[in-house]
Swiss-Prot record:
It comes from Homo sapiens (Human). It comes from the Eukaryota. Keywords: Acetylation, Disease variant, Epilepsy, Intellectual disability, Nucleus, Phosphoprotein, RNA-binding, Transcription, Transcription regulation. This is SR-related and CTD-associated factor 4. It holds the Pfam family RRM_1. Residues 879-913, 966-977 have a biased composition (Pro residues). Interacts with POLR2A; via C-terminal heptapeptide repeat domain (CTD) phosphorylated at 'Ser-2' and 'Ser-5'. The gene is SCAF4. The keyword RNA-binding applies.
């Protein structure tokens, strides 16, 4: 009994809840009942007691409890072992008598459950049919419920039609029919006439009608025979699945209704069920809409018997004899009644226009008007299937239809608004076509089993069709088509029916209920964001609900349609969803809120134009419903609404704004082809930060669009590389930023820019490429940190080489030295760089982009300047050191130790030596544009050592970078002579801190480099140590040695590269230098290389030319020693060691 008591408590706790009852609660009750299955009789009695004693609003929840318990028991234990179903059926009539005491609006839910039971075989038809009839009887008081009952009940009981209840119903219906407005009866009959047989019946009816009073009482036997034959056909056609009657618009509605019941059958959704039906109706205003829809269903079911009955109206129905001949008398009475409304039917057929007015009240009347349309005959076929149930349904349907129709003025209006259906029938001779069309209109229709448009919307539509026809017969098809299209668009946008003289404020706010208290905003957002953007989410955890404001009405509508159908869960808890009143609607207007449609219909005379804008909060204004006098005021809301609805973005999209953006992008697109265009684009971007890459991003985006075109054009670009360079550059990060600044002047003559770029590019790129490759090779061999060093060196070297080459130099230097050094090098190279700023940006990119070729650009960038440039920023700290070393390294290789080149000296690029010479490498060195001046500055000893050895150029570099003296070690004689290692260290420290910064702007790096060198030096020292057995570590501090070793390695690596290059041109020199180098390194390394070093430093300025030659020799010497060494790496290391040892020795 504990289980029974628990169930009792659980069930009666419903009283404490406000309907609708949640699914979770229903599940708890069901579980408690199943637990008490051993005392199932007690459980059944408790439920019946609850239904008997509860308040009217809890009647339907009590029915849901019965349904849930029975279905769960059947599912869990099987239909054979289910004990609850049979027990409930014993006293079910009394129970349903209490159930029908529920509010009239809930009776449709009871019928819904009965239909589900019938459909799923929960109870036998013999049990269900009387209950449906009971609903019909109560429906006399409450026609809506009756309609639903008839529609849905009748299809399942079709066979039962002949049963006594139908017969009784028929007589009842007969009186009802006379009572019904003729228009209502016509609505029902009209649907019947839609079938082909119905049309035949129509003809017969016309014969009846021809005499103002049909000869119904004295129907000719022939006529009766015809009617019966048609009825028989209808019966036979019913062979189509009875569900097909659903195909018939009314039956379909029922089917849709059933399906809705099945799909959405949720105890929580009690109110929603009604809402759903309305939703399915789309325009159906209220449950009456479903009821109205239902009446069509009855007619559909009636078709077999009812269709004839309708055709000859009621009399045929009885005569049809489904119930039996006995029925005929009532049928005749019906027929007499029919006589009263037949003239109207005739009138409608003859003059639809006149009868329009009556028809609208009966949403179904339009169907009657449709009769003339042939397309409906196919529809009639679907109707046929329902024939067996037709009689009862028909009788009930008359009553039900009658009231539903009267109750459905809104539906009628909506339907009227749906002229589309008219055309649908016109365009589609096939029932199916029209059906599919309507189905497409409303998703629910689609879902209906039969596939025919759901009866509600359909029959509504069919009504609208006939009505439209009558009403709009004068209208041109094109106009109707436009109207239909507009209506369809509105439906797709989720906009409700338009009411005359009424403003529609469509809510975009959804209410989601029954949420678990742990549910987060993210959970809700993830549920709804798939439908569209969410404006805001307001969670109310205590109430377990949330208000979600969607940006677009259409998205909210789709979310509601989908989530209200299936069993969607958040945090494993089923949710409910419904329209919520948007915040903008104040209390004064809440009375106009329609929760079913999610719209507030505010009469124009109640609207204050100044409030229109506020209505849009959490909703949108339906621009089609606004008073033309307000248009100016609500435009903002309208625009927002349009955007929200996704409907009229045109309003919100100011044409001007669109053109503005479009023009900009458009020019960019053409720009690729017309090089001239890009400059304009670039300038706009340039205005902000022309030189900085930042521009590039802005320019980049437009150029991005262009660059792809540019690349497309890129194919052609080879011929016009300069032009392409702009677009290409714009696409390229560097070019866009830099090019814009540089190109503006040279844009017209991009060629002019490219030439500078080209020489520097070609030379620097080749040289740089060589240098980078050599550096990488040497570094990889000599330096444990070759990658970093190589990157730095490569960058530095490339920068130096560029500097050395004049025009090329500025870009490279700037590119390599994006930091302050860039400006300084530029200043040093001022003569060389035309536009240091722009050139730097442009040239560097150009170097990186060698050709204006798109392909090359990306490729070269990584290997060439661009990559160094890019790397440089990140590697700047490490590179600065390697750059000095590298710069000096290369200089030693090429011209001895002209370290200044690293700063911008051309000496550093001996590999470019030939170029350097023509470029004025000596000149640069001498004049001090880059190398000379810097070297003179840094190389205090340069003049003295000019005569001395190739190292002279290197010597200056050495003073600048003591370690670079060791690169001379690669040219060993100079390095050894460059004893200034001590001096170098001093110079480095002194000059690096001051001079280097001044000259190269890198000196800051130089100092860093020394520190880095220490880091790298350790690594290099290790490698060097292996190769530098000669060095005496004791002479100098390991740090210094490490620095020197690093520098030497860098120099050697660069030197080797330079040497290789120089060796090509100066093999003989190399031989000479090798001899010298071998002798000198030893002497300098361990004798007093400092002296020798000093003269080279002093000589640097004068020795530039000589240094270049000597560099070649020194390189040769270095190369040879390196060759002599077991491996290049070791060789490079050993010379470094030698120089390092020499440097150490002086100290």
């Amino acid at each position: 009994m504990d289980a029974v008591n628990a169930f009792n408590q659980e069930l009666f706790s419903l009283m404490d809840m406000k309907p609708p009852i949640s699914r979770a609660k229903m599940i708890l009750i069901t579980k408690a009942a199943i637990k008490a299955i051993k005392l199932y009789k007690h459980v059944v009695q408790i439920v019946e007691k609850f239904i008997k004693k509860c308040k009217p609003e809890y009647k339907v929840p009590g029915l849901y409890v019965i349904d849930s318990i029975v279905r769960q028991s059947r599912h869990q234990f099987g239909t054979d072992k289910d004990v609850f179903g049979p027990r409930f059926s014993k006293n079910i009539t009394a129970t349903f008598q209490y159930l029908y005491l529920c509010p009239s609006e809930d009776k449709s839910k009871i019928v819904r459950v009965l239909n589900l039971w019938q459909k799923n075989g929960v109870f036998k038809i013999e049990i269900i049919q009387p209950l449906l009839d009971m609903a019909a009887g109560t429906s006399n008081a409450a026609p809506v419920a009756e309609n639903v009952t008839n529609n849905e009940g009748s299809p399942p009981p079709p066979v039962k039609v002949s049963s006594e209840p139908p017969t009784q119903a028929t007589p009842n219906s007969v009186p009802a029919v006379p009572q019904l407005p003729s228009s209502d009866a016509f609505a029902a009959v009209a649907q019947l006439f839609q079938t082909t047989q119905g049309q035949q019946l129509q003809q017969i009816l016309q014969t009846f009608q021809q005499p103002p009073k049909p000869q119904s009482p004295a129907l000719d036997n022939a006529v009766m025979a015809q009617v019966q034959a048609i009825t028989a056909q209808l019966k036979t056609t019913p062979t189509q699945p009875s569900e097909q009657k659903a195909a018939f618009p009314p039956p379909e509605q029922k089917t849709a209704f059933d399906k809705k019941l099945l799909d959405r059958f949720d105890y929580d959704d009690e109110p929603e069920a009604v809402e759903e039906s309305k939703k399915e109706d789309t325009t159906a205003v209220t449950t009456t809409a479903p009821a109205a829809a239902v009446p069509p269903a009855p007619t559909a079911t009636v078709p077999a018997a009812a269709a004839p009955a309708a055709a000859s109206p009621p009399p045929p129905q009885a005569p049809f004899g489904f119930p039996g001949d006995g029925m005929q008398q009532p049928a005749y009475t019906q027929h007499q009644n029919m006589d009263q409304f037949q003239p109207r039917m005739m009138g409608i057929q003859q003059d639809p226009m006149h009868h329009q007015v009556p028809l609208p009240p009966n949403g179904q009347m339009p169907g009657f008007g449709l009769l003339p349309t042939p397309p409906f005959p196919p529809m009639a076929q679907p109707v046929i299937p329902p024939t067996p149930p037709v009689q009862q349904p028909f009788q009930a349907s008359f009553q039900a239809q009658n009231e539903p129709l009267t109750q459905k003025p809104h539906q009628q209006e909506m339907e009227v608004e749906q002229p589309c259906i008219q055309e649908v029938k016109r365009h589609m001779s096939d029932n199916r076509k029209s059906r599919s069309r309507s189905a497409s209109r409303s998703p629910k229709r689609r879902r209906s089993r039969s596939g025919s448009r759901s009866r509600r919307s359909r029959h509504r539509r069919s009504r609208s069709r006939s009505r439209d026809r009558r009403r709009h017969s004068p209208r041109s098809r094109s106009q109707e088509r436009r109207d239909r299209e507009k209506e369809r668009e509105r439906r797709q946008k989720g906009l409700p029916q338009v009411k005359p003289e009424t403003a529609s404020v469509c809510s975009t706010t959804l209410w989601v209920g029954q949420l678990d208290k742990r549910t987060t905003q993210q959970d809700v957002a993830s549920l709804l964001e798939e439908f569209g953007p969410i404006e805001s989410i307001n969670m109310i955890p205590p109430r377990g609900c949330a208000y979600i404001v969607m940006v677009h009405r259409q998205d909210a509508y789709r979310a509601l349609q989908k989530l209200s159908r299936g069993n969607y869960k958040v945090n494993q808890k089923s949710i409910k969803i419904a329209w919520a009143l948007n915040k903008g609607i104040k209390a004064d207007y809440k009375q106009y809120w329609d929760v079913e449609l999610g719209v507030t219909y505010i009469p124009w005379d109640k609207v204050k134009p100044e409030e229109l804008e506020s209505f849009c909060e959490g909703g949108m204004l339906d621009s089609d419903t606004l008073n033309p006098d307000w248009k100016g005021i609500p435009k903002k809301p309208e625009n927002e609404v349009a955007q929200n609805g996704g409907a009229e973005t045109s309003h919100t999209e100011p044409v001007s704004p669109i053109p503005k953006p479009l023009p900009v992008p458009v020019p960019p697109i053409p720009v690729p082809a017309p090089i001239t265009v890009p400059p304009p684009q670039v300038p706009p971007h340039q205005p902000g930060p022309p030189v900085v890459g930042a521009l590039q991003p802005p320019a980049f985006t437009p150029p991005l669009g262009i660059p792809p075109p540019g690349f497309g054009p890129g194919v052609p670009p080879p011929p016009p590389p300069p032009p392409f360079l702009r677009p290409g550059f714009n696409p390229m990060h560097l070019p866009p930023g830099f090019l814009p600044p540089g190109p503006p002047p040279p844009i017209t003559p991009p060629v002019s820019i490219p030439p500078p770029h080209t020489p520097p590019i070609s030379i620097p790129n080749s040289t740089i490429a060589g240098i980078n490759e050599d550096t990488t090779k040497d570094l990889s061999i000599g330096n444990p940190i070759p990658t970093v060093v190589s990157g730095a060196r490569g960058n530095a070297e490339s920068g130096d080489s560029v500097k050395m080459y004049g025009s090329a130099v500025p870009p490279a230097a700037p590119t390599n030295l994006p930091t302050p050094p860039v400006t300084q090098p530029v200043s040093l190279l001022g003569t060389q760089g035309v536009a240091p700023g722009p050139v730097i940006g442009l040239q560097a990119p150009s170097t990186g982009l060698l050709g204006a070729r798109p392909g090359l650009i990306p490729l070269q960038r990584p290997p060439g300047m661009p990559p160094p440039h890019l790397q440089r920023f990140p590697l700047m700290p490490p590179r600065p050191m390697p750059p000095h070393m590298m710069h000096r390294g290369p200089p030693p290789g090429p011209g001895g130790f002209a370290m200044p080149p690293p700063h911008g000296m051309k000496g550093p690029f001996p590999p470019h030596g030939p170029f350097v010479r023509p470029g004025g490498m000596p000149g640069l060195g001498g004049p001090g544009p880059g190398p000379g001046g810097p070297e003179d500055r840094d190389g205090r000893q340069q003049p003295p050592q000019q005569p001395q050895q190739q190292p002279q150029p290197q010597a200056p570099q050495q003073p600048q970078q003591q370690q670079q003296q060791q690169p001379p070690p690669s040219q060993q004689p100079p390095p050894t002579q460059q004893q200034p290692q001590q001096f170098r260290n001093d110079n480095r420290q002194q000059f690096n801190s001051g001079r280097d910064q001044e000259r190269f702007g890198r000196r800051s790096f130089g100092n860093r480099v020394e520190n880095d060198r220490e880091r790298y030096g350790n690594r290099n020292d290790d490698r060097d140590n292996s190769n530098r057995d000669r060095r005496e570590w004791g002479r100098r501090s390991p740090d210094r040695d490490r620095h020197r070793d690093l520098e030497e390695r860098n120099r050697r690596s660069s030197g080797h590269r330079d040497r290789e290059r120089d060796s090509r041109d100066r093999e003989s020199r190399r031989e000479k230098e090798e001899a010298r180098g071998k002798e000198k390194p030893e002497v300098t390394d361990r004798a007093g290389g400092n002296k020798t070093v000093e003269p080279p430093i002093s000589q640097v300025g004068n020795v530039d030319t000589a240094s270049e030659l000597e560099k070649g020799v020194s390189e040769a010497a270095v190369l040879k020693p390196s060759e002599e060494l077991p491996a290049e790496a070791t060789s490079s290391v050993e010379p470094e060691k030698d120089s390092g040892s020499a440097a150490e020795a002086p100290r």
